[in-house]
């Protein structure tokens, strides 16, 4: 089958975006993997699918598939590319759209400066809802947050557990470039205490309003940037009393700005950052 696609990226986190709004797109996990393959396909961290919503009061449905073929709940950098895509394709002329994701809805706004502002929703810190198994563990309070000990290859790492619609484990490190992210990331991702696996975040505090971040993503490995990972890290840092909003997040792919008023109940995190169209094309996929 032949399939038209658009290649996009948000701070280096790259995507294959498909229009399933004006035409049916039903891909198998094997076809998703073929599209995302960097040697034999287009190459991407995730595949993004635009569809008609299945609930009332929203404009589009936003689905995300990791390069391993599995569908996931959320992708913040992809959300910025999503709104740029639907506007460029003429599917909407609105600057702000409401989008259905796997666990609720989010609002995406194209700003005058070309960056996209994403309402990322409210972070969840309840371990059961992340989910994270705490049986037999004793947490440690730091500020308004609870840190949990995690055995990583025989070393105890103290982590914050956060859900941004998808699960995150965030730890503070001294030097994010020197830290063994590629060694510890996959161990944390598949740790038995995370029944749905987890995105592993490694955060270096630069100042009260600035961090450096690397994320080993569930099902994708380390990516150049992770929007939900940036939000989870900032939320954890603010709760721990280490950061003040807004926070500039430096990733290998570029910078994101995260804002959050943690003093207001149910207040969402806001993420601002770039969305770039790289090229469009057509590919022959195996049936």
Swiss-Prot record:
HAMAP family documented for this protein: DAP_epimerase (MF_00197)
One biological process term in Gene Ontology: lysine biosynthetic process via diaminopimelate
Protein family per UniProt: Belongs to the diaminopimelate epimerase family.
Xref: InterPro entries: DAP_epimerase_AS (IPR018510), DAP_epimerase_DapF (IPR001653)
Name this polypeptide is given: Diaminopimelate epimerase
PANTHER family given in the database record: DIAMINOPIMELATE EPIMERASE, DIAMINOPIMELATE EPIMERASE, CHLOROPLASTIC
GO cellular component, one term: cytosol
GO molecular function, one term: diaminopimelate epimerase activity
Function per UniProt: Catalyzes the stereoinversion of LL-2,6-diaminopimelate (L,L-DAP) to meso-diaminopimelate (meso-DAP), a precursor of L-lysine and an essential component of the bacterial peptidoglycan.
Summary of subunit composition and partner proteins: Homodimer.
Entry keyword set: Amino-acid biosynthesis, Cytoplasm, Isomerase, Lysine biosynthesis
Biochemical pathway: Amino-acid biosynthesis; L-lysine biosynthesis via DAP pathway; DL-2,6-diaminopimelate from LL-2,6-diaminopimelate: step 1/1
Catalysed reaction equations from the record: (2S,6S)-2,6-diaminopimelate = meso-2,6-diaminopimelate
Catalytic residue positions: 75, 226
First and last residue of the signal peptide: none
Residues at the site labelled Could be important to modulate the pK values of the two catalytic cysteine residues: 168, 217
Database matches in PROSITE patterns: DAP_EPIMERASE (PS01326)
Species the sequence originates in: Paraburkholderia xenovorans (strain LB400)
EC number annotated for this UniProt entry: 5.1.1.7
Location in or out of the cell: Cytoplasm
Gene this protein is translated from: dapF
Main location: cytoplasm
Enzymatic class: isomerase
Binding locations of substrate: 13, 46, 66, 76-77, 166, 199, 217-218, 227-228
NCBIfam families linked: DapF (TIGR00652)
């Amino acid at each position: 089958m032949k399939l038209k696609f658009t290649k996009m990226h948000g701070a280096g986190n790259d995507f294959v975006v498909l229009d399933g709004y004006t035409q049916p797109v039903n891909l198998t996990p094997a076809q998703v993997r073929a599209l995302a393959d960097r040697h034999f396909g287009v190459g991407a961290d995730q595949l993004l699918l635009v569809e008609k919503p299945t609930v009332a009061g929203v404009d589009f449905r936003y689905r995300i598939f990791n390069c391993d073929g599995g569908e996931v709940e959320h992708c913040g950098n992809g959300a910025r590319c999503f709104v740029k895509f639907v506007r460029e394709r003429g599917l909407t002329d609105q600057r702000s759209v409401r989008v259905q994701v796997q666990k609720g809805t989010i609002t995406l706004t194209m700003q005058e400066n070309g960056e996209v502002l994403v309402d990322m929703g409210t972070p969840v810190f309840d371990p059961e809802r992340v989910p994270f198994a705490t049986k037999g563990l004793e947490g440690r309070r730091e500020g308004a947050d609870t840190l949990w000990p995690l055995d990583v290859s025989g070393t105890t790492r103290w982590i914050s557990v956060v859900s941004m619609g998808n699960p995150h484990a965030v730890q503070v490190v001294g030097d994010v470039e020197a830290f063994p992210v590629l060694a510890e990331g996959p161990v944390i991702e598949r740790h038995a205490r995370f029944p749905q696996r987890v995105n592993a975040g490694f955060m270096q505090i630069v100042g009260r309003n600035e961090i450096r971040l690397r994320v080993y993503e569930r099902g994708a490995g380390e990516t150049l940037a992770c929007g939900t990972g940036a939000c989870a890290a900032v939320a954890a840092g603010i709760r721990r009393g280490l950061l003040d909003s807004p926070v500039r997040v430096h990733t290998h792919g570029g910078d994101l700005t995260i804002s959050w008023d943690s003093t207001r109940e149910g207040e969402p995190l806001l993420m601002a950052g770039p969305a770039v169209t790289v090229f469009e094309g057509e590919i022959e996929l195996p049936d």
